Amino acid sequence: ARRGIQIDVFTRSQDPYIPMISQGLGYGARVIHVKAGPEQPLPINDVYLYVDEFAQAIYEFAAEENVTYDLIHTHYWLSGLAAGQLREKWPSIPIVHMFHTLGRMKNRVATTDRELAPPERIEGEQKVIEIADRIVVATPAEQAQLHWLYGNRSKKEVVVPPGVDLDKFKPLPREAAKAHVGIPVHDRSILFVGRIEPLKGVDTLLQAMALIQERYPSAVKKVTVTIIGGDPWAHDPDLEMKRLQAMREQLGIRDIVTFIGARDQNELPYYYAAAEIVVMPSHYESFGMVALEAMASGTPVIASEVGGLAFLVQDGENGFHVPSRDPETLAERIYELLVNDSCRERLGRNAREHARKYAWSNIAEKMLEVYDKLLMPAEEKESSRSRHVENPL
């Protein structure tokens, strides 16, 4: 929007009392809440039932407002399917899509049936691959997964990682940040941020903390592990939250680990800055936005060596890699950073510098290049192609 591009962001209305059109993203960008199914939060798999209604609502809004769009950029497979519906009405508008996560990858790491992606998601993702003119992937690993798991050989993919707001996520005086979020200023803070689901590996973190308490009891006397995500006070908390809370009791780490539920985005920078360590023990991450936000805050990350985390976190340079589902190795790495101040501070400084590469201004330029190439007139595309083709002779 800051480059003079008018942007309309469509989302499904979840509250009838929220204005249909919001200017909250700033000049040149609108958030438009359209009715598609009940105006309330729904389980993600139920949203699939209202994709057609969502697409129709977008089409009707554009017609009523007399708006024409040059390009559609969709995120997640459900929005990609909506774009497929719009393609029937707007056949000449190119579609750019970003999956963020892939159902078949989630299925490969699932350990229970309830973690599996539904069949309609797998079919939907395959369809979106066919629909899209360009597929944005966060890392080369995600590109390889599309080829390997979905048989995609279309060469539609372009690697453009997500960006981070370096003004919002930045190093802050740690004691002041701890005081702001209510962590004792002399405690060492370990932080997890994410959805409370088996895929995120919170159980591995709990097991690792129990090992540290057993082996190095003095090291955890002033340690606070904060779990951000979910709703631990819900009248009927979900199965994973119940399982993790029970595990905390069984492992005897109630005094160390605190579940504090979801937090407002504007509060997260203080939690990152307050933490000595951010832990991401995920079994699968297409990128790892939490890791990038932590790194921008100058906080080292210990992450599973999976998916995008294997690219984002550089082992021994700005954080540590550990194998997925390995509480022993995770415990040793956490302990190392708890007791080695110079190592922790070095990794934190390097993390902030590495995060600068992902500044939103840089990422926006890369995305604009993708848009410009798609919108280039056909004759210019052919001319550009001929200039860039190497002569095999």
Name these PLM-found stretches.
Residues 13-14, 18, 118, 126-156, ...:
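A short, active-site helix/loop in glycosyltransferases that binds the activated sugar's phosphate group
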